């Protein structure tokens, strides 16, 4: 346990930041799941509305990821990895491979 006041305050600040980061990451994951679900819906029933839903959900997820990187919740490489993962899934869904 911390002995001086500054160490006690650092413990409080670390706990506060942990909770804030946790909620931010949870919101980011939720937006990513929505994008994946939109891709699944488009795969089952392709339409222009479904395509717009994919684009909107991807833009929302990208925005949240970028803000998480900017505020220090995520490392920039982790953010880039998540965005790459989303992009590849969306690209495979919208533009199927033609042989």
UniProtKB/Swiss-Prot annotation:
Pfam family, one: Ribosomal_S20p
Keywords, sorted A to Z: Ribonucleoprotein, Ribosomal protein, RNA-binding, rRNA-binding
GO MF annotation terms: small ribosomal subunit rRNA binding; structural constituent of ribosome
Gene3D superfamilies found in the cross-reference section: Ribosomal protein S20
Top-level taxon in the UniProt lineage: Bacteria
One GO-annotated biological process of the protein: translation
One Gene Ontology term, aspect cellular component: small ribosomal subunit
SUPFAM superfamilies per UniProt: Ribosomal protein S20
Family that this chain belongs to: Belongs to the bacterial ribosomal protein bS20 family.
PANTHER family, A to Z: 30S RIBOSOMAL PROTEIN S20, SMALL RIBOSOMAL SUBUNIT PROTEIN BS20C
Cross-referenced NCBIfam families: S20
Function text: Binds directly to 16S ribosomal RNA.
Protein name, as recorded: Small ribosomal subunit protein bS20
Protein's gene: rpsT
